[in-house]
Amino acid sequence: MPLMGSLYIGASGLQSGQNALNTTAHNLTNIDTTGFTRQQTLLSSKRYITISKNPAAVSDQQYGIGVNLSAVRQVRDYFLDQTYRKESGRSMFYEASTDVLGEVENVLGELNGEDFQTSLSNLWTAIQELSKDPSSSVTQGLLVQRSAEFINRANAVYQDLTNYQDNLNKQIKEKVTTINQYGKQIQALNDQIRKIECGGIEHANDLRDTRNQILDELGKLCKMTYSEDSLGNVSVRIEDSDFVRGDLFYEIGLDASDATGFYTPFWIKDAEYTVLADGTKKYNIKGAEVFNLDQTVSSSLDTDIGGLKALLLARGDHRANY
């Protein structure tokens, strides 16, 4: 091998080592960055030069010309990503449900320093006393007093529960807005990643980190599945319906009930509509709802995934009439 060839081999090793050190420095710099994925440098040998061929020999006489930086890849596990996002969605479902139950317990148990059960027990005691002596003006007056107390407390409980329903309705609107924002961001990142990686030379690791972080957050809000194609596009489905497909984004709309003002998430792409005189669209969301709330909540059926679905179930679709 010529002297310059030997020097080139050494230079390629130094250059590849420098690239590996740069990757290590990048990992250390971003160790506390949310969503960052550790990167790994892959090295491979450059092509070999054949000196001579001998059919009787085990192999040809060759020598290498150095080492090459093959790729800088992310160290991620697709199976673990899918499992984490699914289970984080299930965790958020039960966390949201627990928060709602806790709030209802507070309304029933911490009303003005005295729980609702006390007023109910006092009313029942007054009725029992009246049954012993119906002609007694004292027991009659006590029943009237206890009844008034019970009605006042019942009205207060009803108002608190109604206000909490409105609060849940507001949270539902905010979460749908957040989901749509995530969809637009994934669509934009798909476009950027595709442009960078189309030449087969560069790998958009930092953009992929951002997209993976968005998928992590999206998995907490709803039941979603995703897949990546050969171009680097990630397609996302929510509740078995397309949400992002390549460079396409399908928005989730909100239909407000005329009677209650409660929002129902629906797929705009699947809903029929009529154009009103003022130019606005009136949607018919039948069959276009994002969530089927009639399904039995079950881990075996995967119907207990996503904080948004938990809020919809907790809020209900009507106001109670007590």
List the predicted regions and their residue ranges.
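Structural signature of extracellular appendage/secretion-system components
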Residues: M1-Y322
